[in-house]
Amino acid sequence: MRDYTKQYINGEWVESNSNETIEVINPATEEVIGKVAKGNKADVDKAVEAADNAYLEFRHTSVKERQALLDKIVKEYENRKDDIVQAITDELGAPLSLSERVHYQMGLNHFVAARDALDNYEFEERRGDDLVVKEAIGVSGLITPWNFPTNQTSLKLAAAFATGSPVVLKPSEETPFAAVILAEIFDKVGVPKGVFNLVNGDGAGVGNPLSEHPKVRMMSFTGSGPTGSKIMEKAAKDFKKVSLELGGKSPYIVLDDVDIKEAAKATTGKVVNNTGQVCTAGTRVLVPNKIKDAFLAELKEQFSQVRVGNPREDGTQVGPMISKKQFDQVQNYINKGIEEGAELFYGGPGKPEGLEKGYFARPTIFINVDNQMTIAQEEIFGPVMSVITYNDLDEAIQIANDTKYGLAGYVIGKDKETLHKVARSIEAGTVEINEAGRKPDLPFGGYKQSGLGREWGDYGIEEFLEVKSIAGYFK
């Protein structure tokens, strides 16, 4: 059992002002594996005060000092690799291989990217006799999701530390263990007191007072659209800066000159990875009518090879949904797809055979999907693919952009000119050509209802800065 009932505030592990705790469930076993403090407004107030006091000195640290701090974090993060991997598999249900290859590694990559971005980042610019200065924004509230416990947390922390902005972090109460390990890392390497504060709890007890606190100058949130909207409302009371990374319903356009096996394998991965609990999942697969039959045959073959099961067993590729609530949501969407007339091609409602314990869902494919159906318009956040056919490229692009979201898009094929045309036409913050992957120094964020602002690398650093003009500085 992992019992983390203390908060990390002002460089110390302290008792929570609340006597309540939150149980953490292993989604693969449905068993309680630990608990964390259920913080409240008093905890938030104490943490914000510590961060505000730390800001007075941390904002004036040099770039080299902040780089040195990030470098220490990188090295200690690497030392804690096994602890991080084990924690994520326990709390998220991610297969061990995925926890190591993706979750652990992505967290590390963001600290490295922020450290390296500072090599060439210009915080000052001379314009004649005047000076433009970029300064740390100040106390920043970070609220992170359960689906990527290290990635989403590390990218925000790394950017804030790179600028000299102290933070108060509220991780998801469903996957809080990785954040506790990060706190232990920061404590060991000597992150200055008050620069990092961890307050565990739920949205009502911690998220709301953090978003409303008058000394918090910036809120960075990753999660659902409705919650992001509420954070904006609360932040608007004192005009806080807000950075939001929200949902998606990303299109994956398959071109007619594609290698069919390669395309089927790629689109399968984009749907089942992390059990489909990915905001950038390419769940709307757009296929030319002329290759539909061949593509579907290969797609079924690829899905049949996906192994769902115990995340601690070798060979497991897909673990459980994070919770019963999430499992039920996925089941509701699958049933909705059937009700609205989509054809169930693979998978369907219920659990995979032999997996009655745990929140396991069946990887599912719908075909003959109309883009106006619920399963094509709403974020399911599970391993459910909607295959939509198109007749020509203009129609494919129109379907791809017919969504309220714009977080990511994908295209796969051979003709470079066509690939470039599609990539430039998709209305999304990130587009991948032929499974190129996203490097941590590239900006990440969404169009439309997928968010505000950008994260990752130097663009992520920009979010934690204010710009000051000093006229006559060089006179």
From Swiss-Prot:
The keyword NAD applies. It catalyses: an aldehyde + NAD(+) + H2O = a carboxylate + NADH + 2 H(+). PROSITE patterns: ALDEHYDE_DEHYDR_CYS, ALDEHYDE_DEHYDR_GLU. Keywords: NAD, Oxidoreductase. GO terms for biological process: aldehyde metabolic process. NAD(+) binds at residues 146-147, 223-224, 246, 379. Its EC number is 1.2.1.3. It is an enzyme of class 1 (oxidoreductase). InterPro entries: Ald_DH/histidinol_DH, Ald_DH_C, Ald_DH_CS_CYS, Ald_DH_CS_GLU, Ald_DH_N, Aldehyde_DH_dom, Aldehyde_DH_NAD(P). One of its GO terms (molecular function) is aldehyde dehydrogenase (NAD+) activity. The active site is at 245 (proton acceptor), 279 (nucleophile). Belongs to the aldehyde dehydrogenase family. This is Putative aldehyde dehydrogenase.
